[in-house]
Amino acid sequence: MEDKRNAESASLGASSGGDSKRARVAARPVSLEDVAEFQKEAIFRAMETYRREKETLEKQLETQGEKERELEERVVRLGTWWDKVADRLALVVGKYEFEKSKVKTEDVKKEEDTERDAGDEDEVEVAPGPTGLATDLELEEKSASISSHFSTLLDLIGDKISKQDKTEVSRLSAGYTDMAEQRHLLVRKIQDLEHEAQTMKNQYLAAAKKLDRYKSPTVKLIEGEDVEEKAEENGDQKTAQMEEKKETEDSPDTKDTGDTKALRETIQVQEEQMKELDAKIAALEHEASLFNAKMADLSESDLLDHSGAFKAAKEQLSDKTGQILALEKSRDAISAEKMALDENRQQYRSTIKREFEKRESELRSQLSRAETDLVRIRTARDEILADLSQKKATEADKLKTIESLKELGEVYKLRIGTLESEVQRWRKEGNEGVNMSSNVEGKSLEELKKEVTVLTLTNQSLMAEIPGMEAAFVSAQKMAENKALDVADRESRLTKLLAEKAKADEKYFAAMRHKDALGAENAKLKAQMVKSSELVNQLQEVDAKTRAKIDVLEKTLSEYVSLHAKQQEAAKRLTSQVAEKTHMLNGAQKYLTTLKEEMKQQGTKLSVGEHRARKLALDNAKLTKQIELSSFGGSSDEIDELRSIAMCSLCSKNWKDTALKVCGHVFCHQCAQDRLDARLRKCPNCNKPFSQNDLLTVHL
C-alpha cells in the first residue's frame, strides 16, 4: 500500500511539474526545534493519510459485510427451497417406486425381509450433528439426490412431454441466457468503474498528501516562506468565514505560489472527476441492485404478465399437477384393492395351510399305526418261521426214525425167519426122537448114520440160519454205526447250535439295548417335535398378529402421508408468505440502514466541521499571537512558542510522544495512560473515544 501511494504521489508530482519540489534557500538557519517540528508534521500527515485509508476501508468493509449478509440469506433461502424441492421429488418418486415394488412375489419379499433384518442387526446409525451452512459433502449429496430424483421423474413423465413444452422450455432457457449475459456485462462494467474509481481515489489521496505537505508551516519555514502564508494555507478555503479572514490577513507576501495554484487546480479537477465517478458508480450500483433484486425476487404475477412462455409452462404445470393428483388417487385405489386382495390371499393361504396340517397329522397318525402293525406282523412272521423250522427239523428226525424202524423191522423179519427155521429144526429133532450122544464107539452103523443124517440136517439148518444171522448182524452193525454217527452228528450240531444260540443271545441283547436307546431317542425326538410344533404354532400366531399390525401401520402411514402432503402444501404457502414478509422486512431494514448511514455521515461531517473550526480558531489565535510577537521582534519568543507546540497540551511538562489513531492528536504517554486509567477514554480536543490499542508511539 505504501509503495502504491509513493508511486501515485510520484506520478502526481511529475504531472504537476518538477518545480514543486525545487530546493529553496532558507531565510534563516534551521534549528533542531524546526527539524523536530518538521518530523512531527510529517508523522501527522502520515497519520492523516492512514486515517483516510482507514475510513475508506471501513466503509468498504461495511459494504462488503452487508453484501455478505445478503448473500448468506439468499444461500440459506435457496438451500431451504432446494430441500423442499428434494423432499417433494423424493415423495413423488418414492410413490412411483412403491407402486413398482408391490409387484414382487411373496418368496422374494421374505428373502428381502430376512436380509433386511440381518442388515439391521449389523447396522449402527450415526445421527449427523446440526450445522449452519451446508458443507461441500452435504451439497454434493444433495445435488446427487436431486439429480437422481429428477432423472427418475423425467424417465417417468418423459413420454408425456410434448414438443411444444420442449420449445417453451428452450425459449425460457434462451431468455435466461440473455439475461445472464446482460448481468455479466453490467458486472464487468461495474468492475471497470470500480477500478477507475479506485485509481482516482488513490490519486486523490496522493494529492491530499501533497497538499498537506505544501500547507505544512515547518516545510515552508525550511523552504524560506513566511509563517503568515503557512497559517493561511492551513485554513479551510471552502468556508466563507475563513475566506473573509484570509482576505483581511492576506498581503502581497502571503499569496500562493504558482505551483500551489496548479496543484490546487489539479486537486479540484480530480475532486470533480471523483464526484462524477462516484455518482456514476452509485447510479450503476443502484441499477445493478435493482436488477439483482428484481431477478432474485421475480413474482409470478410479473412472469405471467411479461412472459407468455412462463404462463404456458404454469398452465402445463397445473395440468401435470392435476394428472399427478389423479394418478395418486388411482394409485391409492389400486393400493386399497391390492391390500384387499392380499388379505384374501392371506386368508386363503391360512385356510389351505390349516387343511394341509390337518391332513398331514392324519397321515402321520395312519403311518404310525401302519408302522406298528408292520412291526407286529414282522414279529409274528418271525415266530411262525421259527416254529416252521422247528417242525421241519422234527419231521426230518421223524422220517429218519421211521426209516431206521423200517430197516429194524426187516432185520426183525429175517431174525423171525431164522428163528422159525430153528424152531422147525428143533421140532423135527424132537419128532424124530434121536438121542445124540457123544460116545460114538458104542453105537452101531445105523445109529451112526442116523446121527450123521441128523447132524447133516442140523448142519443144513444151521447153514441156512447163518446167512440170515449174518444179514441181521450186518444190518444191526450198520444200524449201530449209523446210530453212533447220528449221535456224533447230533452232538456236533448241538455244539454249533449252542454256539449260535450264544451269538444270537448276544445279538439279541445288543439289539434290545439298541432298541432301548432308539426308544429313548424316539421319545426325545417326539418331545422335540411337540415343542417344535408348539413353537411353529406360536410363530404362526405371531406372524398373523404382525401382519395385522403391518396392515394397520400401512393404513396409518398412508393417512400420515396424505396428512404430510397437506401440511407441506400449507407450509409452502406459509413459506411464501414468510418470504414476502421477509423481503418487505429486508427492504425496511435496508432503508433503515441507509438512514443510519446517512445520519452517521452527517454526524461525521459535523464533527469534522467542528474539529476543523476549532483547529482554524486555534490556528487563528496562534497566528494572531505570532503576529503580535513578530511585531515586537522576539525570536526567542517564537522558539518558545514552537517549544509549547511540541510540549504536551495537558501537562505542559512532557514532550508529545503518543498519538491517537482515531483522530491524530498527539499527547505525552503519561497523560494518555492517566486518562485511560481514570476511564476518561475520549480525546480532550475532539471528544472521539479511544482505547489502549489506539495509542501510537511517535519518535521525534
UniProtKB/Swiss-Prot annotation:
GO molecular function, one term: ubiquitin protein ligase activity
CDD domains, sorted: RING-HC_Bre1-like (cd16499)
Recorded coiled-coil stretches: 39-78, 178-383
Keyword Zinc: yes
Bias (Low complexity): 8-18
ZnF RING-type span: 648-687
Pfam families: BRE1, zf-C3HC4_3
Catalytic activity: S-ubiquitinyl-[E2 ubiquitin-conjugating enzyme]-L-cysteine + [acceptor protein]-L-lysine = [E2 ubiquitin-conjugating enzyme]-L-cysteine + N(6)-ubiquitinyl-[acceptor protein]-L-lysine
Biochemical pathway: Protein modification; protein ubiquitination
Gene Ontology biological process terms, A to Z: chromatin organization; protein ubiquitination
Protein name, as recorded: E3 ubiquitin-protein ligase BRE1
Organism for this UniProt entry: Yarrowia lipolytica (strain CLIB 122 / E 150)
Gene: BRE1
